[in-house]
Amino acid sequence: FIESYERLIEMSDAIDIVTPTIAHFECASKALRASKHVFIEKPITHTVNEGKKLVSLVTEAGVKAQVGHVERFNPAFLAAKEYLNQPLFIETHRLAEFNPRGTDVSVVHDLMIHDLDIILSVVKSPIKKINASGVAVVSDTADIANARIEFDNGCVANLTASRISLKNMRKSRFFQRDAYISVDFLKRKTEVVRLKNLVGEPGPLDITIDLGKNKGSKIIYFDQPKVEESNAIKMELEQFIEAIRSDKQTAVTIEEGYQALVVAHQIMDKINSSLNVLV
């Protein structure tokens, strides 16, 4: 029997923090001040200020820190990554049936933040503008929310998250030049539609589209990449351990977790300022 979590920290080399969000900073900061490696569930902290302090503590401690954005390890997303190339428009839907667990934070911090992290990891461009709206239906924080993010490179992302739906859905669609990639995180399925210039005459089974007079035609290719069977939670923890053993950068850095938190708070600021949520 271990009488306190401080004693547990003292006895450990690495700490996995899965407490309610409001306790993340307290637990993580104690572990970091004891020079322990830290794996911390999303969102990294309750407030942006706490997140900023945590980033500094990780640097000062010189240890490994990874954030539990588990969808990065979803096999459907892993299968889609090689096809993603400067998407121009992204649409995400993350819908869940109501569960009292997680209502200590808004649906933006509980669910949408998964898609925010995925999008930020793919787009890699500063954000130019955010518009958002949301409503609190059964809890004291937003239960359904929509956000539109415009990036400096021209990409636009439209995100919808709900925790009061009748069915579950976790799907993202990426539109880019001559390609469309659909990722179903729930069913673990990836579909890719690609266009290529038609050279010569099409084959008997080719599907083509005519682009108009003097613009030629394109062939439509349908791909369904193989999605490997894997356990995303196990994979993220294994990569965390490997980063410690090999002294490599963690798969989802504390800075990336902080950036997702910052954007989530910016979205909630927009929602709260719209007066659609009673706070």
Regions found by a protein language model. Give the residues of each.
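A contiguous active-site-proximal alpha/beta segment in oxidoreductase catalytic domains
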Residues: 45-102
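Beta-loop-alpha module in the N-terminal Rossmann-like domain of NAD(P)-dependent dehydrogenases
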Residues: 1-39, 43-55
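Mid-domain beta-loop-alpha active-site segment that forms a flexible
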Residues: 68-75, 98-129, 142-143, 257
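Contiguous beta-strand/loop segments that form the cofactor/metal-binding neighborhood of enzyme cores
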Residues: 116-195, 199, 226-230, 234-248
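C-terminal helix-rich "cap/oligomerization" subdomain common to oxidoreductases
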Residues: 14-17, 235-279
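Hydrophobic residues in well-ordered beta-strands that form the structural core
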Residues: 3, 40, 65-67, 91-92, ...
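Structural alpha-helical scaffold elements that stabilize or flank donor/cofactor-binding regions
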Residues: 7-8, 83, 260
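A short helix->loop->beta-strand "cap" motif at the edges of active sites that frequently abuts
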Residues: 34-36, 61-64, 155
